[in-house]
């Protein structure tokens, strides 16, 4: 698991000048159905077409495993996660390009997440586990609000087509193996997309899913059984991790 440390503001993706002095820059590719606002930020409430971007993230050298430290009034690249740069990628850039290597890792965030939080968690995971495979983050339009559970649940369902399209783009770009890592409500979204691909007979994409990891999945046992029955043979390996201390699940249970 990757948690945010301290009582800090919510993460955003506004480039920070302090990041220019950082030594460790981790690139995270992002596919999102969040609509971009006029000033360039991604909206929390509006679902738009799937777009791509590359976010270069400053990862602090002094960071603890599993902890994302956000900046305070004095951002320090040695202690804080900072946005170094954001580069929009034109159109369906993945489908028209080529992916180095055979394997791609896709992370899917859960309930109550800003876009920055999902990207920073992904950068932390890449750094902690020394992931060499190309890693993408799917950012669906969570409201990023503790009391926005119902709205997030609807947004996750609306985001199914965007995630399926992103997986199709990854396949078309040459990936032979796709590993899905989903947290909380993102796990339900992931299961829904696997089910949707099977029902739509998109076996060309489904067959590329080589592994699934669900972290503290926010799915009832009855719903999971129904999804799994519709999917049939689940990708192998298929791993589920649970945690009694997951803050997203504690909020959803209220």
Which residues does each predicted region cover?
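Gly/Ala-rich beta-loop-alpha elbow adjacent to hydrolase catalytic centers
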Residues: 163, 182-186, 190
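Flexible, membrane-associating and regulatory peripheral segments of lipid-active enzymes
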Residues: 3-105, 112-131
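Alpha/beta-hydrolase active-site loop
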Residues: 150-172
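The feature captures the conserved acid-bearing segment of alpha/beta-hydrolase catalytic domains
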Residues: 216-254
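Structural cue for short, hydrophobic secondary-structure segments
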Residues: 107-110, 137, 181
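Cap/lid segment of the alpha/beta-hydrolase catalytic domain
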Residues: 139-154
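Short glycine-enriched nucleophile-adjacent loop
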Residues: 187-199
């Amino acid at each position: 698991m990757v948690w945010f440390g301290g009582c800090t503001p919510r993460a955003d993706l506004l480039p920070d000048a302090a990041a220019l002095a950082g030594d460790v820059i981790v690139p995270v590719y992002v596919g999102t159905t969040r609509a971009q606002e006029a000033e360039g930020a991604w909206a929390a409430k509006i679902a738009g077409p799937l777009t791509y971007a590359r976010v270069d993230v400053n990862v602090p050298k002094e960071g603890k495993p599993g902890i994302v430290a956000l900046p305070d009034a004095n951002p320090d690249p040695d202690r804080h996660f900072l946005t170094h740069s954001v580069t929009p990628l034109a159109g369906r850039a993945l489908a028209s390009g080529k992916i180095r290597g055979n394997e791609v890792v896709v992370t899917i965030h859960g309930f109550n997440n800003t876009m920055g939080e999902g990207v920073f968690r992904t950068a932390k995971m890449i750094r902690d586990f020394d992931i060499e495979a190309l890693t993408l983050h799917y950012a669906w339009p969570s409201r990023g609000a503790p009391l926005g559970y119902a709205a997030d649940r609807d947004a996750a369902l609306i985001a199914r087509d965007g995630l399926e399209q992103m997986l199709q783009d990854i396949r078309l770009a040459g990936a032979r193996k796709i590993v899905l890592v989903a947290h909380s409500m993102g796990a339900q979204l992931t299961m829904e997309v696997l089910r949707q691909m099977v029902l739509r007979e998109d076996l060309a994409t489904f067959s590329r899913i080589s592994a699934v990891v669900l972290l503290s999945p926010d799915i009832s046992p009855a719903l999971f059984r129904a999804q799994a029955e519709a999917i049939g043979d689940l990708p192998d390996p298929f791993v589920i991790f649970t945690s009694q201390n997951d803050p997203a699940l504690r909020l959803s249970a209220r």
